[in-house]
Amino acid sequence: MSAIPLNRILPLGFLFHLLIFSFISLSSCMEFVEDPNNQGRISLQQRLGNQWAVGHLMGKKSLQDTDFEEMESFAKRNVENMRAALLQEQNRAESERELRHAQLVVRNILEQYLKNMQN
């Protein structure tokens, strides 16, 4: 019987599959290659337009339009508003504490009254 040994077939099969896969990958890559003549036109179109928020220029436009004197007065008004809100919150918390205390006193009075009524 003249059979071809397995150790001779495996390297040939590996080589065949390697060539097939490289050809398939090369053909699929060729579909996505752009025309070199269009590349200049595409990059030129990308440069047109507003670039104030691109890369290292991110946010620079908004900083240039700010008036620093206006920022200081805004900060003063903001601190005053925060102080007023804090005082209002403290007053509300104190009134809630007073309300809880009054409720506790009324509850104690009612409990004492009910105990006296049952006796």
Curated annotation (Swiss-Prot):
Residue(s) carrying Methionine amide: 58
Gene Ontology CC terms, in alphabetical order: extracellular region
Keyword Secreted found: yes
Top-level taxonomic group: Eukaryota
Tissue expression as described in the entry: Localized to the cutaneous granular glands in the skin and the brain.
InterPro entries named in the record: Bombesin
Keywords recorded for this protein, A-Z: Amidation, Amphibian defense peptide, Cleavage on pair of basic residues, Secreted, Signal
Its job: Stimulates smooth muscle contraction. Role in induction of hypothermia, stimulation of DNA replication and release of many gastrointestinal hormones.
Family to which the UniProt record says this protein belongs: Belongs to the bombesin/neuromedin-B/ranatensin family.
Protein name: Bombesin
